[in-house]
């Protein structure tokens, strides 16, 4: 099973991790946090899942990665980064290489193969062999303007043109790709209750974001302090998520709190909605320190 294979890779490389079947399947942490969605067919990953994964990753400063075996049309090749709704998408072997510090140099995007080259290295190598920008452009089959732009800043270049440049200049120019994603649009609270809780936390000085397909649905941040929270009127819904919230909090080293309308006994700090209006941010911090 693919999920087990990925967890084995994580264990062998010293990661602590937990599972949740939502916008991510594995939250893993060593020096930093990775949020992994694991699917045999990566085309089954939906845009709503991607938006929630982006929001969660932005707030946690985590790396979101979609790991799979194939699309509907082809198998995923190793050492190539694919793209699905702006989430870096890789094969299991590529993930293992990334964990070992070996980042791919090829991006598959919208049917094309792209790379990035080092601008300073390109200019230096061109000058070392005595070629003008026009000379190099002619040999590679691109425009002089394109050579100028690639010497000025990092830009995507068609992979085959990057290979031609390296062959012409007899040096390595391609650089490892960063695991980038686009920023997520704000996700609105889905209920009046969630909106009221968010309003109370904002009054205390917290910035709040909502995220779904996750064991919790609200993230609250104040300066360098951050907490994850499951906010729901019904405690039976929260009780289903408690083990996942606890594990996620332990793995990511983020404080967790539960907010509901009813009394609930659990291993996570809890607050009732009617307690919030009289609280300040320092009260929240004190509550979390006691746990």
Show where each model-derived region lies.
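Conserved hydrophobic/aromatic packing and binding residues within compact polymer-binding modules
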Residues: 122, 136-137, 147-150
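Helix-turn-helix/homeodomain-like alpha-helical modules used for DNA recognition
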Residues: 2-5, 13-26, 177-243
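Catalytic cores of nucleic-acid endonucleases
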Residues: 39-90, 215, 231-275
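DNA major-groove recognition helix of helix-turn-helix/homeodomain DNA-binding modules
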Residues: 155-175
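Recognition helix of helix-turn-helix/homeodomain-like DNA-binding domains
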Residues: 141-156
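The alpha-helix within a helix-turn-helix
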Residues: 82, 126, 137, 166
């Amino acid at each position: 099973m693919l999920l087990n294979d990925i967890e084995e890779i994580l264990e062998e490389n010293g990661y602590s991790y937990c599972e949740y079947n939502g916008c991510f399947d594995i939250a893993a942490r060593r020096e930093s946090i990775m949020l992994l969605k694991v699917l045999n067919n990566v085309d089954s990953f939906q845009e709503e899942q991607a938006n929630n994964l982006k929001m969660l990753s932005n707030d946690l400063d985590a790396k979101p990665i979609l790991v799979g075996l194939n699309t509907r049309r082809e198998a995923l090749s190793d050492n190539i980064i694919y793209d699905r709704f702006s989430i870096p998408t890789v094969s299991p072997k590529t993930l293992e290489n990334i964990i070992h510090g070996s980042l791919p140099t090829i991006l598959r995007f919208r049917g094309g193969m792209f790379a990035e080259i080092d601008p300073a290295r390109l200019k230096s190598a061109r000058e070392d062999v005595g070629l003008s920008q026009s000379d190099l452009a002619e040999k590679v089959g691109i425009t002089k303007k394109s050579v100028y732009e690639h010497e000025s800043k990092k830009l995507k270049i068609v992979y085959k043109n990057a290979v031609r440049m390296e062959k012409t200049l007899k040096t390595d120019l391609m650089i490892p790709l960063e695991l980038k994603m686009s920023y997520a649009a704000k996700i609105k609270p889905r209920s009046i209750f969630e909106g009221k809780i968010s309003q109370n936390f904002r009054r205390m000085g917290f910035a709040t974001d909502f995220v779904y397909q996750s064991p919790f649905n609200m993230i609250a941040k104040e300066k360098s302090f951050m907490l994850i929270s499951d906010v729901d009127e019904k405690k039976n819904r929260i009780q289903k998520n408690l083990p996942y919230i606890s594990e996620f909090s332990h793995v990511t080293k983020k404080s967790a709190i539960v907010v509901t309308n009813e009394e609930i006994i659990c291993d996570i700090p809890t607050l009732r909605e009617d307690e919030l209006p009289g609280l300040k941010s320092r009260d929240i911090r004190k509550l979390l320190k006691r746990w």
